Amino acid sequence: MDVGELLEDVLRIYSPSHGEADLAKYLLEYLKRFVPDVWIDEAGNVIAVKGSGGPVVWLHAHMDTVPGPLPVKREGGVVWGRGAVDDKGPLVAYLKAFLDSNPRGTLVLALVTAEEDDSAGTEALLRGGPPRPDYVFVGEPTNLHIAYAYRGGAKVYIELESRGGHASSPIYDNIVEELFAVYQEVKRALGHAERYDAFTVTPTIIQCGEAPNKVPTKCVMVLDVRIPPGKSCRDLAQALPPKARAGPCTEPVEVSPTNPAARALTRALLKLGVEPKLSRKWGTADFNLLVSLTKNIAAFGPGDPALAHSEDERIDIAQVELAAKALKLAVEELGIIPRRL
């Protein structure tokens, strides 16, 4: 398969969260050319299986991207487009590794929906579907680092209302000012700091005002809050001031950096002449959910995470190919390791 060509093709299919159907159909037809056991499940996930028996290894990546299409272009060995880094570059690497691998057990490719939103695709996999995994590799842009920890996360909402009034009159309370006061209160309550081991609070959406000469009657601010190790969703909820509320929350997770999946990747990279590097991720991903299936898990993939969700998403095709080679070696090594029951 031509990795660069496939990457360009999937980038041209815009697939924001809950809008992955066209991409899923494309990937289904593509995979059918190589493996017979492939389908789209009730959550819109594309699932492919090869081999049989144990151990069972999952290659997991997500089809969706953040909103906002970008033009797709290729210059030399670099491809630009929405999702080039997060997560279509890793997805293509995982797809290639799946097709190239000769597993001694069962190999599952799970290309899921809505990771950037409510993780509906992975939630469906947790309820059932393909054979349960002994080992999981999660496709995320790690720049070929092996990630073993992710922070938790939740959206926090500040929603204020007032009677409004004429902008020329100072007698009215202005909820714009109150909105920012509550935001600062949230930061103080959580001990916001730009460190991995601290809560981080980032405003992402502000909706406020109806006219330039009118005191607003409603203001909404959405905060992206990340939860550090050692803290929990409960800690977040208990710390929030009365005028802020948390939405659905994901707990932080950490597994052993020497678990079999991580070790298999370490050895694979060494065989390829790449220095293995471990990392803890500042974000939140389906990794946080998949640890409920197995602690033998690692996140890994091509792409610079600093470019994820940006207007300059781009990825080096050679790194996608290198990631696929490392995954293939790791999958085949795990096939000769006795399962941990």
From Swiss-Prot:
Its cofactor is Zn(2+); Co(2+). Pfam families: M20_dimer (PF07687), Peptidase_M20 (PF01546). One of its GO terms (cellular component) is cytoplasm. The keyword Zinc applies. It catalyses: [amino-group carrier protein]-C-terminal-gamma-(L-lysyl)-L-glutamate + H2O = [amino-group carrier protein]-C-terminal-L-glutamate + L-lysine; [amino-group carrier protein]-C-terminal-gamma-(L-ornithyl)-L-glutamate + H2O = [amino-group carrier protein]-C-terminal-L-glutamate + L-ornithine. InterPro entries: Bact_exopeptidase_dim_dom, LysK, Peptidase_M20, Peptidase_M20_dimer, Peptidase_M20A. The active site is at D64, E115 (proton acceptor). Belongs to the peptidase M20A family. LysK subfamily. This is Putative [LysW]-lysine/[LysW]-ornithine hydrolase. It comes from Pyrobaculum aerophilum (strain ATCC 51768 / DSM 7523 / JCM 9630 / CIP 104966 / NBRC 100827 / IM2). The gene is lysK.
